[in-house]
Amino acid sequence: MKGRKIFRAVAVSLVLMVLFACCGCSGLRQERYSSSFFDTFDTLVTVYGYAKDATEFNEYMGIAHSRFIELHELFDIYNNYEGVNNIKTINDNAGVEPVKVSREIIDLLLEAKRLYAETGGKVNVAMGSVLSIWHDYRESGLAEPELAELPPYDMLEQAGLHTDLDQVIIDEQTGTVYIEDALLRLDVGAIAKGYACQLVKQELVEAGFESFVISAGGNVCTSGEPAEEGQTSWLIGIQNPDTQAAAEIVDTIEVRDKSVVTVGGYQRYYTVNGERYHHIIDGDTLMPANYYESVTVIADDSGVADFLSTTLFLMPLDEGKALAGEMGVDAMWIFKDGTFDNTDGYRQYSAYYMASS
């Protein structure tokens, strides 16, 4: 419950027992492999998994990497790619014409609209006009810290007039997306990476890969159970949002066929006059949310977990707990003072509570 300190919690070695276990344990038919790449979604993506040999694992990695590249290009809001209509293409044609897009983009936007409606509208993928202002000021502030400044609030307010998700018209029959408001911009950063992880997981399972973890920044997506004797769950460490603390991990959770997503203001920010301003912007205030240091969500679906982690970060604890219950997910909130709170269901996954019971 809130008020209890968590930094006594869990040794890093507990995480390493599974995530860095030796390959080819005696008597097992499968060995553990891992591989990473850093060319998609602006983050390091690592796949840990069990396969009969390196050739088989590399085949699965080829599927994962190529699919992540494809989804990265489709969901990108900053860059054009030859022969690809992506989110940027939709934005560039706002108020001009509908854009023919892939099924993946259609489904992503439909899911974002569904979750927006079901969760009170705290996370809005039509807020790109506001988020782009914060992005530009943050990038400038990081490049020249001595000149860092906040965006003028009247600029944010003007951009905030162009965030109506109903202005994003999705036509499934024609496979097009059209933004009616010429000044509205899409930004799918609150769901795209988790959604991509879920798609890649499903396609790897369909290809025959059964026991693996995809780790993409704060998104961890698990499939099956570790092919290690005596192991029935994956052990996932939750990062300490206090990056100066001695303990890098504040809790370890045991999950199987679940996704774990953590968001926090410590991950991407810049400093103005000694104050940190992170990238998670509240659509009501047009300013960074200030309730928590981080929020972790455990859910069946990685895209849902991604979206809900940001949603819960943007609302008070009582509202967040109620929403988590309605959505059938579990969560843990870490506050500015290092205390924490969680849903009751979170305890079944937590090494902290297991050690305390």
Predicted features along the sequence, with ranges:
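Mature catalytic core of soluble alpha/beta enzymes
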Residues: 2-357
